[in-house]
Amino acid sequence: MRTFIAIELEEEVKDHLAEAQAETQKLCRRGNFTPKENFHLTLHFLGEIAEDDIEYLQDAMYETARRNRPFTLTLDKVGFFPRGNKGIMWAGLERSTHLQRLFSTLEKSLEQQGFSRERKGLSPHITLGREVEPHRNFIDVQKNVRLEPMKISVRSIALMESVRKGPKLVYVPLFRMDLKGR
């Protein structure tokens, strides 16, 4: 099963992101845009895991949740990771020491359970589209699409599975851990 650990987003946040995504689509020729129901913030991509690994992941996530308390993030920008004339469109967040601490704790807990660290480190973003090709250029899109700042409540982390349902990719939560730290 193909998995990742993520922060799930509330419907209100997903609606807000979908509005920014729709504005961006008007300025683009084409792209593979993320369905609203799949918006999330990835903390650690695991890839293919065995069913037996779930118990170890639960232990790592429990330890992480025990050491971190709920916090708030702020969504505040739209950006691109360009790859030639196409790129990945994302929504970005203000820097957060709480998010960095959550990520660091998760990485240590996963490593103690025998999993590899995230090779790219933490680059907090919510993917809005892949293979996005703007009519003009990425800078033009960024100038013309405003993402009004919005607060995101982070109360839990979830182990998600990527499941193919026909032509669609669906992210299914396998379990969640509420943040309980002090």
Task: State each model region's role.
Residues 1-182:
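Histidine-dependent nucleotide/RNA phosphoesterase domain, centered on the 2H-phosphoesterase fold
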